[in-house]
């Protein structure tokens, strides 16, 4: 069976994601869609609106066939590391192609851009270092360096757009690793990634605008038009069971406690706490009464909201620089954690299992690795804002839940 790989967050799964999966299968003529999905916390450092299990169910009910977890060590990272981790896992699972949505929509431009930057990588990095020295943030410095290096590059992708940036890094990772996996793209329909309002006519809205509506209204009334029915059902069920949808503000009391009980030297050892940020963090947390207020006090021209939000998540999970460095030194995936599969997905995995060089994990108790322990810890932190007994129930799912199975013919879940 031929499989297409997708790199996803599904926060939550919406009509644009449904379009993406259908296009991916159709354009690549693949029978199976394999999604590598961020777990409890996402690339921008935010908690997922609902658990990875609920989001897996949304995906399986909407034409994904295999859902595996992108480990925390890759998921809560800058675009380059995020992409490298996801590409490695999809390659390990035997995907013939990687299909991504982008603002540009032309794969030749991505191939040309990636090839040009690989060829001029030393010059690009040197130019970026100069811009950072002038006080620019890492994304701003890279964007300026990139424009300088690619001025003569011809058909080049606009890397000021968020999905173009991720797509560029997928293509670059495939090229640098010399993989046979073929990158392909489709132009995003309607709303942009960061759009915070709903479009007037189209049934496709950004995940950002959907979450904004959900958190502002406390209901799905305004957003259900942009969501598959299965997503609406899962969001409703999650709120009924766990009493909330997760937002960054929910974690502020725990962040405040962590920072008040952590000395400056310990804070300095946390991943992404750089260049004296520990002093700024300590000062901001003393004055702030909310997560938003804290972030406004913390943010500078040099450090973006996203970069600081990731740092805060690493503080919550007590992720140390030394541990990250050691885990990122591994050249191949240490394991692949299966979250869910359809009948067709199960058949595909049975076909590929013998050729896997990394163990396919279905229960966390059957395997031990520092990266997996970090995933479990992230899940425990994720459940912190919940009230008992559902907090313990969600935490226990990290250990007790087997992969979710979905019968795509009868359209029923075989295990709740």
Curated annotation (Swiss-Prot):
Its EC number is 6.3.4.-. GO terms for cellular component: cytoplasm. Keywords: ATP-binding, Cytoplasm, Ligase, Nucleotide-binding, RNA-binding, tRNA processing, tRNA-binding. Coiled coil: none annotated. It holds the Pfam family HIGH_NTase1. Disulfide bonds: none annotated. GO terms for biological process: tRNA modification. Its main location: cytoplasm. The keyword Ligase applies. The keyword tRNA-binding applies. It comes from the Bacteria. It is found in: Cytoplasm. ATP binds at residues 7-20, 101, 163, 188. Catalyzes the formation of N(4)-acetylcytidine (ac(4)C) at the wobble position of elongator tRNA(Met), using acetate and ATP as substrates. First activates an acetate ion to form acetyladenylate (Ac-AMP) and then transfers the acetyl group to tRNA to form ac(4)C34. Belongs to the TmcAL family. This is tRNA(Met) cytidine acetate ligase. It comes from Bacillus licheniformis (strain ATCC 14580 / DSM 13 / JCM 2505 / CCUG 7422 / NBRC 12200 / NCIMB 9375 / NCTC 10341 / NRRL NRS-1264 / Gibson 46). The gene is tmcAL.
